[in-house]
Swiss-Prot record:
<keyword id="KW-0804">Transcription</keyword>
<dbReference type="Pfam" id="PF21354">
    <property type="entry name" value="STAT_linker"/>
</dbReference>
<protein>
    <recommendedName>
        <fullName>Signal transducer and transcription activator</fullName>
    </recommendedName>
</protein>
<dbReference type="GO" id="GO:0006357">
    <property type="term" value="P:regulation of transcription by RNA polymerase II"/>
</dbReference>
<feature type="compositionally biased region" description="Polar residues">
    <location>
        <begin position="675"/>
        <end position="689"/>
    </location>
</feature>
<keyword id="KW-0217">Developmental protein</keyword>
<dbReference type="InterPro" id="IPR001217">
    <property type="entry name" value="STAT"/>
</dbReference>
<dbReference type="GO" id="GO:0000981">
    <property type="term" value="F:DNA-binding transcription factor activity, RNA polymerase II-specific"/>
</dbReference>
<dbReference type="Pfam" id="PF01017">
    <property type="entry name" value="STAT_alpha"/>
</dbReference>
<feature type="domain" description="SH2">
    <location>
        <begin position="545"/>
        <end position="644"/>
    </location>
</feature>
<dbReference type="InterPro" id="IPR000980">
    <property type="entry name" value="SH2"/>
</dbReference>
<keyword id="KW-0238">DNA-binding</keyword>
<comment type="subunit">
    <text>Forms a homodimer or a heterodimer with a related family member.</text>
</comment>
<dbReference type="GO" id="GO:0005634">
    <property type="term" value="C:nucleus"/>
</dbReference>
<keyword id="KW-0727">SH2 domain</keyword>
<dbReference type="InterPro" id="IPR036535">
    <property type="entry name" value="STAT_N_sf"/>
</dbReference>
<dbReference type="InterPro" id="IPR048988">
    <property type="entry name" value="STAT_linker"/>
</dbReference>
Amino acid sequence: METRLHQLPPCILEQFHFLNDLKYPVLIRQHLGNWIKDSLHNAPTYTNNMQSMYELDAAKFFTALVNEVDQVSANLPNKRKCLLCRSAIMLRDQNFQNLTQLYLTLLHQIQPNCEKGCKTEYTIAQTSSDGQQTDVLYGLQQLHVMERNNWKETQQLIQECEQDHVQRLSNQRSHNKRIQCYSLKQRSLVDAFQKTIRKAEEVLNLVYNKYIFEWQKTQMFPEVRSTNAYSLDEIQTWYESLAAIMWNTKDQIHLTMKSQLREHVSQEINSDLWKVMKDVKDFIKLLLHKAFIVENQPPQVMKMNTRFCATVRLLIDNALIMKIGNPKVTVSIISETQAQQIQSTNAAADFSAGEIENNIGNLQYQLSNKFLANFSNMRLKKINRGNRKLNKLVVDEKFALLFQSSFTLEQEELTVTVWTLSLPAVVIVHVNQEQLAWTTIIWDNLCAKADRKLFEVPNLIPWNRLVEAISMTFSARVGRGLTDENMQYMYRKAYRDKLSFSVSNDQMISFAQFCKDTTPECNYTFWEWLYAALKIIRDHLQVLWVDNTIIGFIHKSTAEKYLAKCVPGTFLLRFTDSVLGGISIAWVHESNDGQRQVLHIQPFTAKDLVVRSLANRICDLGELTYLYPTIPKQEAFGRYTAPAIQKPRSKHYISAEMRTVLIFAPSSNQSSSSTPNAEQSPSTSSNDMFSNEYVLTNLDEIYKFEIENDDMLSIQDYWEQQ
């Protein structure tokens, strides 16, 4: 054991010797040994990317240690009480620069099996003390110092006043001088309390406006995991630290006001103490309000009379949960105007723009250290729409869910009302409204800012932001985002621009360009075309899209350029301009006379793919051999094909299936009958982005049929017998 002790780093060895000092720390071991063991027995350990959590745990542990000393010492004789208090304060203050290291030393002793992991974290904790901490952790560290200094000054001032109370009758003149000195210290202490509150407000605003908002952005775009976005569990530890610091500050102010110090407090200072106490309570209310968040958002496109769910969470620790109980939470739906009124007054109200079924729940503590209210079966039964402008559609109107709760902290004259809003939602009554509803949501999510007026959006946003959001939407809904080439094609499509892809950071696009204005050549908008492609991928092509077998968003001329030097039978898949939600096959065709052309098969739509999948159709066509550039067709699509054999209705029948074939229109040149005619060949206008497709029709009119199965061997035999 002695050998292992000497192997410890010098700073830790020094702290260990301090722990075993025979003067004061022995009292800590005697009176708080079991408490320390219980506190650290199940203390969490962290992986390498969460080393900063040890700093928070260490600060909370030693703050709790001093508080535990106060409770234990209440039943001790005065002399022993003072010794115990001083030993606890000395233990913490003398190791302030290495609190995390001391905490890990204790953790090694209580949890030997985590020693290896903790040693790793100890090394990292040392490096993080060189300034590589988050701004929140630095602010919390400052607050811990301020709170501890306030505690020391409060205790010192009270002790001096108690001593003076005994001596003042014997020496009145000296007592008057002391009063002046106390008044200065009292003023300094009040100022220190005020600085602590202001610093706490600064840290809280940083946590809420920056880190909570960054976390909410991941709700808007779930597939994005920002390196700056902390998990809610980590953010909760920040809230817990703020709550502990301010609760201790409230106790310090209360102790100052209730002790014998009142005999020395001037009227002005006494009034300031009451004001500071009010400020602390107001901060605790604000902290709880900003700790109330929507963890699982309701759908942002909400269909009437359709079930949906949501979850709210209060980011506080067990100590406050015990004071709160299980308060009720109510949910209502409010309009954009009502949301703005709540935002401007910073107070919830009995607003409602509709009726929600199963809208009442309770906050309950979970074993995962979460304080949640789950709403798993809500249903929007009624919606009250506002007076819409003449040119404003139903899908342009935004709503939000308002979650509210109210509770009183036990043994405290402190009633707290908390509320929070969901992300904006569009309410629809029919599924065909979903397409335009998503334009409103995507645009709003892109324009979301922590300090904006709910739910106002600008008319223009940068194209780069929009196309990034579109890519994230594809990633979330169909499993893969867009390539740079896809984005280039979309840029030309959105701006109707034939120039090369070169977008500056200040290139803007309007909401009308995005989803209102139709193209002159085609009677649909950019978003309608894009959404139709997204929908057919989601419903019929997702596995192919994720597997990168579909290029999809590529211009016709670019596809022809890619295929121009490929061997006959090479093909690629692209979404067409002329048919919404249509996917076409471009392939290299070689005629009987050896001439090669890039031809395009008539687009398949969702109706076609319901009958027979795209993978099966591709395998039907012997003309197609290689997926661009050189992937054998069976290798790319074989695992996605499935036999479409239908069981006969009775044993007297056999089944047949439909297959896709190409129908080449007859050519005026009989010597080249297999070559498409001029109307089907690439025209001189093929470089025009919005030119009509030149196509070869695919034969789907070979329906499933049944044949009597007596002595018949083939379809031909059957017809010959008729």
